[in-house]
């Protein structure tokens, strides 16, 4: 990215088909594999900047993310190069969602950043650093009527839409010289 090496891992983890409990081991395995990939990158370069992202089909609080990846809720919890920050965990705690199922919202779509992308202080922007994250849920992406009012506007019954998940994003910023 602008000459700066940033490692990006893109995920789409196994669905919850068959039930959350029955399918959870598959996502837990995906979380462990994700952690293994990140650790391999860090072993080669302890200063590696890593972004792992995608539709995890699990929330930030699930075992696959908390234990499998080892994601941290707060930036202040990042102590070593292998630590990874998940800004979407706090958003979930605050009641935000990227998808809805049976009128219950959750955030399965997440972007996490390694310690090397989190600024150590407010002056640490000589290279790309994480600034903020969000859920892109503009009005044109939201179902306006019917049973799924308020849900992401998806293609269904011949009505064009976008997706059953709202997109997520992060800002990486760098000092301009």
Residue map of PLM features:
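Beta-strand-turn-beta hairpins that frame and shape the catalytic cleft
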Residues: 1-17, 174-177
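Alpha-helical membrane segments in multi-pass integral membrane proteins
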Residues: 5-7, 27-30
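Active-site metal-binding loops of divalent metal-dependent hydrolases
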Residues: 13, 55-56
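Second-shell loop/turn segments in exported
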Residues: 17-27, 52-53, 97-99, 156-157
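His/acidic metal-ligating clusters that form di-metal
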Residues: 30-53
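Metal-dependent phosphoester-hydrolase catalytic domains
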Residues: 42-48, 58-177
